[in-house]
């Protein structure tokens, strides 16, 4: 029997480009919607710059609070499970890049720079070979700030056609397509 193939760690990164001072319903909902995806497909979930109330100073407290305020994700059960497994991560907005333990930064966008554009199979090969990846999604109508496009060495358009998707639809599409592609690559190797 062959040992299980070790892949890189995959992380959904949610970057707050809404209001950085006031916590909004959209913040709570996107975490509640992304957590079941992370749990189902064995990804991490990292949030950056969310203005949680000050008393929510740990991921466990954030998960508990979200689970008490939503019916999404089996009433927040998956958010709590992610946190219990150390896979819900809460960070301030990064000032000098993203935490290296999350992996290589990949910008998700419908407008990738041509020279940095990657396909789902490119990302799947990298993850299947052991590279950890942080796939970053911008929240709000403007998406990710342009300065993040500079530091993201890879840009990924899940549609491959420049089509705009609602944030949670994009997250589900990225997680599903990349997880499936990795699974197929690993099946081919075994």
Q: Where does each model-flagged region fall?
A:
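Short, glycine/charged-enriched secondary-structure capping and boundary segments
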Residues: 27, 60-62, 120-123, 149-152
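Short, Lys/Arg-enriched, disordered terminal segments
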Residues: 1-5, 187-190
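Short, well-ordered alpha-helix to beta-strand connector turns
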Residues: 42, 102-103, 131, 151-153
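Solvent-exposed alpha-helices and their adjacent loops that cap or buttress functional pockets
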Residues: 3-6, 98-99, 125-129, 148-149
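Long, charge-patterned amphipathic alpha-helical coiled-coil/hairpin "stalk" segments used as oligomerization
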Residues: 109-148
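RNA substrate-binding interface of SAM-dependent RNA methyltransferases
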Residues: 2-110, 176-180
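Short acidic, S/G/P-rich loop/turn micro-motifs used as interaction or catalytic elements
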Residues: 18-20, 52-55, 112-115, 140-144, ...
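Structured adenosyl-cofactor binding patch, chiefly the S-adenosyl-L-methionine
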Residues: 143-190
